[in-house]
Structures are given as structure tokens and as C-alpha cells.
């Protein structure tokens, strides 16, 4: 990256500390030294570098040669000169622009957003897995036999108040996160260890299931023979391969859908060629070549580059500020560094000659030289381009008495559209230019500007100034706005053609020359000369300023071609600070070396923009789908804020905790209006149609609960032993949990319970399992009764399933004493689907082979012409001043 090394910054700080120390020392020696001869003594043409050691040597030599009085005088003179020189050096150092410190973390987050297809699929998507469960005898003892059932692979319900609907919403979210863009079965296939002829099955989980079934003593011989025959079937002429898989019917439906709706598309050279931004393809400064012909099996996933459907620039100040900040940091990392700048020392010396500072006694013109250094110039160049690329608002820092800064500011306001500056800063700068340079030149009274005036100072001045050239320049600045142009479907903010070709600088120079010829009738002659000399310094570099303007425009437009999201211009909450002394540095130190972005930098910038934009759209699609699902699951109010928070977290760059609530809810409202993407909708429908099967396979979700005032005996069950479970609801009066929750009318159920009538609440609800006999004796099941009778709530209902068998603690209490345990509740739970090998064996079909390429620009080799020969849009060299 193009940032200065940290070591260099430390060295600068050390030097600064040394100079401060030296300044303090010299002040202690002589506090009352006169400062009237600053311009004479400090900026003499002869350069001296004085260190502490040299100072001591010089002083000791002079003392030896002279008597005591002379030595005292000489010591004072040397110290005075030394102090003045150090003071000016320190002032210059203080006025330099500090090196821009990149927020490395934001840049890394942006660059780490990779396209999803980079995650290689190694297994099929599964919700279910077959599990071997024991069988229990009538007395609760475990048999040696086992039976296979389909159970949930991830059977997790978080603790606390939790609704089964939320489980399904989380399951849907999990499916969306894992939903593959493509499936290539050949890549995930593994060897079937039990195969006779080294056949393969579709994935490692299928192989593990086959192994477990093959080794199970109760497996039929026919099934073992079938497993030994399981292998892939290849149809090479059709580029198709079939793999055997063991899947639950619902999982088979999911994977079948993924295979049918893959997002991969054929890839060829034309697609790669058209993927490169058109303006870079057509830019004569870049030489692009395709390295190779692609095979017929090459595939790619088209990035999702829909324009911003949420309009984040509209009423989302915090979010917009974060996006523009991250774009600004990214843009700064790709703006090229200026090369071969004019030597700072040589330029300051030349400027001091032009100003004839040694002949002057006024102090104002020494300020012209403060803050001029190459680091500030480079920093200013990068700030201007990066701020325009990211549409970050800038604020200006300046000192009104530094006329050189204000004259440089006139160039800045000429080439950068007014919208880029925060209004308060723009008004302050324009007012300073009017009252310091323009109005005094014509002998006009100071402008008294009213805060809140809809017109800017330049707009007021344009109407009052009679001079044609000055009024013409003011008119240009007042109407200098970005042109909004849609290129390749992206809204671009384009600069005025007069700025792009640099002609506007001539217009500025005409206005400046007119100002320098005026008499400044109300001002002293020294004031007039100072302004004239400042204008002279800038006008001496007319050619370089034209080149600088063209260079700025070219780099901005070339990098702008790599932006994929609409460039919306809205003032940002925070601003990027720009000091006018750094603009002076840029104007005074710009050389004649052309710098243009390298092709690798452009491709990197383009890829990062595409990846962020594509990820942004995919996350929007996910959030819209989750909101729709939450609505259909009646969780709309409960889950909404967390859905929006998850959406922002997955965009990587946001600090979600700091986003104001009003913007969260506005974001929710905008997401709610968007249509659901068809693939995501189909996936939700698959889950919604099979909710009962998923509930049955869970060890934590029941289909209802039976409540009685009197104890009910625990029953024997093959799957659990002694258990308070009901497999059907025959003979019980049923109340729907959904309706009870909706109506809030608990009178019916309370009356039934108090009249000793058992009642069945039907609906999916979570339950917990307890296998301790002691806990069954120790407590009544208040978890249900209290919720119903006292709290009048069913949304936090969580019954306990008591499971007593030979695996339980203290089982001997039941076995030895023929005790019949009882409970006041029964959990209504249907039997999970039994695993049937024949019904679970599916053949899945996919392409035999294809290769997905995620980085299309890797096939393009690119180079540039010699920078000195680089041309702008008008087919003339960018930098003409050689």
C-alpha cells in the first residue's frame, strides 16, 4: 500500500522533539532576544546546518580568539540567529500535514469480503441423520437390540423463553447461510470402503452411514450386498455422473433443489473481456491481454450487482457515514503516490527569492512558506481524489493572514465542486478570499455576511464586481457541480470538461492577474505587494497547475470506472479535514512526472468493490427472506430488530451497537417492501411443508402437552422405558395452543383443570428431559400448572419428560420395589420416522466436472504505457509541461 512507513513517522516525531528541546534551551539562555530581524537572518541564501556539537565548537573557538566582552556579544548574536532559525524550522514542521493513518481494520474487513463460491462444498446439506437407538423391555431394562431412526443432526433449542417457531426461523437462517451456489458431486465423493470394486458414494457422511449399517449385526444380508454394489455411474458422453447417497426424503428434496438451481454459468473469453470496466478497456494508457483459452468446462458465478435497493444515502446518516468512510479508506489505498516532486528546500529558496524576503521587514510573507513539504502535497492529492471517489464531505482549515493559502484555495475551489465541502467551511473560506484579496483589490468595503444566508459569498460577490474576468471566474466556481452520468448502469459523478482538460486554470489565472493589477486603494502598499507576490508565486507555476488539474481529473476518472455502486452525493456526518497549507504544498511542489494507477491496483480496487457490492445484495436477499419467514411464523414483532442487526453484522464494516434505533426501524421498513428472491422463497416453503416431520425428529420439541389435576401413571415405551408420554390424544379434550395464545382466554382451561378434567394443549412446544427418579418423587410438575393457572401464559410453557429406564440414576428404586411412578402431565410426542435403507437410498446427478473461477481478472495480463506518454480523454498528454 501507498502509505508512509511507521518508522518514518517515528523519526519525524523524534526530530520534532529534538527541535522543541533545542528551542526551549535557547529560550532559557536568552528570553529577551529581539525578533525584528527574522526575515533578514533566517532565510538568507546561505544554508547552514547547525548541530549541538558544532555550536559548542564554534562558541569555544570564538571565545579563544577574543576577549571576554567580545565573546559575550558574539555568543548572543550566534544564539539569537540560532533561535530564529530553529523557530522558523519548528513552525514549518508544526504546519505540516500529519501523515494519514489508515484504519487498517476497516480496510482489512473490506478486502476480506470474498465471493461465497470460494467456500468449497465438501458435504451435502443435511438436517437429519440416522441414529441407532436402544429398545427397552416392559420392565424398563435395556435390550441388546437396536433400532434406527431419523433424528435431527443439530437438535439445539436455546435455554430460556423460546418458541419452536424461533427454532424454525433459525433453521431457515442456517439453510440460507449454507445454501450452496453450486454443487459438484465429484469434488465431495469419497470411497465406499465396503464396495467390491472401489466404488464411490456421494460424500463422507453417506460413507459413514453405510459403514455403520454394514457393521450392524441386525442388518439384512440383502442390504449388505446392496452396499457392496454401491458405486458411481458415469455417462461421459453427456458429462454427467450419478452418485448413490443416503438421505432423509426432506434432505433429498433440499439437495435436489440445489442441484437444479445452480448459479454457475459458462465462462469464456468474451465474458472476461466484458467483465473489465469498459472505460479501462478503452483507455489507451492500459494494454490488456488475455493469457489463455478457457476449457469448455469453465464456469463462473455472476456477481449480484443490483443497485442499492435500500437507498442507504437517504435518511441513514450513521450507516452512510460508515460506508463512505470505508470507501474513502479503500480509495486512499489505491490512489497513486506523486513522484519526483520539486525539492522542498530548493522551492522554498526560490520562493523566498521571488518574494525578496531579505529586503522586507513585514512578517506576513514568511507565512507563505510555512507548511510546504512533499508529504503534505502527496497527502492532499490522495485526500482530494479519495474524497471524490467515496463522496466524503471535506472541511477546510486555514489561517486568514496566510495569503498564499487563500490564493491556493482559489485553485482548490476552482477544480473541486462546491458540494464536496461542508457549507460552513466553504462559506468561511470564500469569505476570507473575498475580504482579504478580491474586495480590497477594488477598494470595496468588507463583506458582512449573515449566517444562514442562502447565497454564498462568491454568489454575492459575482453580482457586485464589475471586472469581467473576476466575475467570470466567480460565476464558474458558483456553478461548479458534478454532472450525474449513468455509465454501464452505474451513476457516476463526473467533473466539468473545463476542469478535465485544465482550461479552467487559465480562467483562474486571468482573474488573479486582474486582481494583482488593481490598486488596493484602501490598503497600505505593503499589503498590496504581499498579495501581488503571492499571486506571482502561483502564476509562475501556471503550466504545472494545468498539468496538476489534468492529472487529478484523470486519476479520479480512471479509478471511478472501478466503482460498481451508484455514487450518491449526500453530505456526510463526519468530514475529512484538508488544510490549505497542504494545497499550497501541492501547487508549489508538483513536478512533471505523470502518475497513473497500476493495472494491478485498478483490478484490486474493482474486485473489492464487486465483492462488497455482491455480498451487500446477497445479505439483503437473506434479510428480506428472513423477514418474510418471521412474518409467516407470526414472529414479526419479536424478532425484527435482531434480524436487522444480523443483516448489518454480515456486511462486515458496521459497528452495529452504535447504529441508532430509528435507523434500524427505518431499515426494517425498507427491507419489508422488497420482494423475496425465488430460490429463498422455495427453500422456506420446503421447510414450512415439512415442519411436522422436523418436530418429530427432535428430542426437544413436542406436539403438545396433556395436563390433569390428578396424577397419571407413567407408561412403558419401547424407545424410552417408563415415560410420561402420549402417542395419541384419544379421549382428551383438545385446546389449540395457537388460539389460546392469540385469544388470551384461559377461563375454559382453568375451569376444566379445577373440575378434575384432563386437557390436551395441542401445538409445537419445547420440553426438557429428566431421567432422575429422585426428582420425579421430589416435586410436582409446576412448570406447566403455574404457567396456566397462575401466570396465564403459555408462550413460555416447557413441560418435563420423565424418562425412567435402566440407564437412569436410581433405577433400582423402581425395579426393586415395584413402584409405579406418576406425573400430573404427559408430553404428546409422535414417533420419529424409522430409518428404512431402501427408502433412503437416492441417486444424485450432477455434471461430471467443471471448474469454477472466482477471480476472472486473473486471466488478464495488463501493463501501462510509459507514464510520460499517458494521454487524457482529449488525446493529449496528461502532463504537457516537461
UniProtKB/Swiss-Prot annotation:
Site residues, Interaction with the intermediate capsid protein VP6: 222, 226, 230, 841, 843
- List, in alphabetical order, the Gene Ontology terms for molecular function in this entry: RNA binding
User: Where is the sequence biased in composition, kind Basic and acidic residues?
Assistant: 9-27
Alphabetical list of Pfam families matching this protein: Rota_VP2 (PF05087)
Q: Where is this region: Disordered?
A: 1-45
Looking at the UniProt record for this protein, which Gene Ontology cellular component terms does it annotate, in alphabetical order?
Answer: T=2 icosahedral viral capsid; viral inner capsid; viral nucleocapsid
Superkingdom of origin organism: Viruses
Does the keyword section mention Repeat? yes
UniProt signal peptide? none
Q: Where is the composition biased (Polar residues)?
A: 28-39
* Region feature (5-fold hub): 1-82
User: Sorted alphabetically, which keywords does the UniProt record give?
Assistant: Capsid protein, Inner capsid protein, Repeat, RNA-binding, T=2 icosahedral capsid protein, Ubl conjugation, Virion
Q: Where in the cell is it found?
A: Virion
Q: How is it modified after translation?
A: Sumoylated with SUMO1 and SUMO2. Sumoylation of viral proteins seems to have a positive role on viral replication.
Q: Where is this region: Hydrophobic?
A: 396-416, 424-444
Q: What's this protein's family per the entry?
A: Belongs to the rotavirus VP2 family.
Role this protein plays: Inner capsid protein that self-assembles to form an icosahedral capsid with a T=2 symmetry, which consists of 120 copies of VP2, with channels at each of its five-fold vertices. This capsid constitutes the innermost concentric layer of the viral mature particle. It encapsidates the polymerase VP1, the capping enzyme VP3 and the genomic dsRNA, thereby defining the core.
Subunit details: Homodecamer; each decamer is made up of two conformers of VP2, called VP2A and VP2B. Interacts with a VP1-VP3 complex. Interacts with the intermediate capsid protein VP6. Interacts with NSP5. Interacts (via N-terminus) with NSP2.
Q: What is known of its domains?
A: The N-terminus binds RNA. It is necessary for encapsidation of VP1 and VP3. The N-termini of 10 VP2 molecules form a cylindrical hub underneath each 5-fold axis of the inner capsid.
Tell me the protein's name.
Inner capsid protein VP2
